Amino acid sequence: MNRPHSCLSFCWMYFAASGIRAVETANGKYAQKLFSDLFEDYSSALRPVEDTDAVLNVTLQVTLSQIKDMDERNQILTAYLWIRQTWHDAYLTWDRDQYDRLDSIRIPSDLVWRPDIVLYNKADDESSEPVNTNVVLRYDGLITWDSPAITKSSCVVDVTYFPFDSQQCNLTFGSWTYNGNQVDIFNALDSGDLSDFIEDVEWEVHGMPAVKNVISYGCCSEPYPDVTFTLLLKRRSSFYIVNLLIPCVLISFLAPLSFYLPAASGEKVSLGVTILLAMTVFQLMVAEIMPASENVPLIGKYYIATMALITASTALTIMVMNIHFCGAEARPVPHWAKVVILKYMSRILFVYDVGESCLSPRHSQEPEQVTKVYSKLPESNLKTSRNKDLSRKKEVRKLLKNDLGYQGGIPQNTDSYCARYEALTKNIEYIAKCLKDHKATNSKGSEWKKVAKVIDRFFMWIFFAMVFVMTVLIIARAD
């Protein structure tokens, strides 16, 4: 039972395959006959219209497949497109009933007339026309030509908001020799087709609207239509944020820290110059990417502003170091500086001497040696001049009486004791004067150092605020 059934199935399959092969053979014969009949007296050099005054309509559709390159420096967009053109050829029609219901054939595109649609704003010397692929010829004369093309078009790049910029690149297609009275061009859709677009790693495509334009040139009175596709691009900024912006922000916050570095370390100016050189390297990296235009990119403005801050901080650091190393030969700190800087600003900025804090009041304690010397000397000896010998002798007599323990009168050799005590008094006054001068000298130097430290701390917070505000403004403008 199964064997006859299998034989019957095999016979049916054989006859079906034979029938299909016979149909294909018949269609092939009719296609060859149709091709011979159509192109026997056909010329692809002339516009395929029966009336020479008639307008031939060409419909254009562009599909964006891939963005191959966006050269901002040379302002060239390289794109991979699929271009579809459709038009009617009045001389390539046939009756389907005469050719076994054959409704379409595919033939080489160079055998038929083709509209000379070119990319107006191409940016390369080589031809960017579509590839010579086959065309689909329908029985009613409708010709459809699908062909891929790699185009290089000029694109005006606005880098003002780089790396947060958006670009608009135009692709303008039109006939090169025919005017609008001979060949008219239309866009098949309101925008380019993005359904088969391959995502780009650097650019986001937000649309590709199409619009028809009719332009009249000064040389000719006839209109010249074209179809312009505007490619809306937005840059993916993550790469530039990580590699250019974040390092710049971190380096810019290092600039105020040069004021926090102790002046005695000798590295304040070196740090500022090193930061300035690092910013210069980043600036050169951005300059290599950007076109040489008058529009300065946003990140370039940030670099320039940061470099200006670093230059100013380095100059101020030199000034502060000059104040810090004021020695004994320098003038005393002015009164207004003592009040404004040492009294108020130092408290506001929490700048104190060693061992001093905001909770413990500052007491000026004299050295123990100086206190002992002044305790031994009467006030009259510290305030009177040396020409008052009479007063000095009286005081010396009192000292002799107290020190020698006499209860009665003064001994006869008082003059010798007076001479000794007078010499001793002069020595003590000299020592006290030296200690006082030494203290005044040290006090003068320490006051200038504290002034420099307060100014350092003041500029540090000022520059921190400026860098922070500048960074926020740049990010706000980018958004």
UniProtKB/Swiss-Prot annotation:
Transmembrane segments: 238-262, 269-287, 302-323, 458-476
Topological domains annotated Cytoplasmic: 324-457
The reaction(s) this protein catalyses: Ca(2+)(in) = Ca(2+)(out); Mg(2+)(in) = Mg(2+)(out); K(+)(in) = K(+)(out); Na(+)(in) = Na(+)(out)
Tissues with expression: Detected in the nasal epithelium, in the outer hair cells of the cochlea, in the pars tuberalis of the hypophysis, and in the developing muscle of the tongue. Also expressed in the neurons of dorsal root ganglia.
One cellular component (GO) term of this entry: neuron projection
PROSITE patterns: NEUROTR_ION_CHANNEL
Name by which UniProt lists this protein: Neuronal acetylcholine receptor subunit alpha-9
Gene: Chrna9
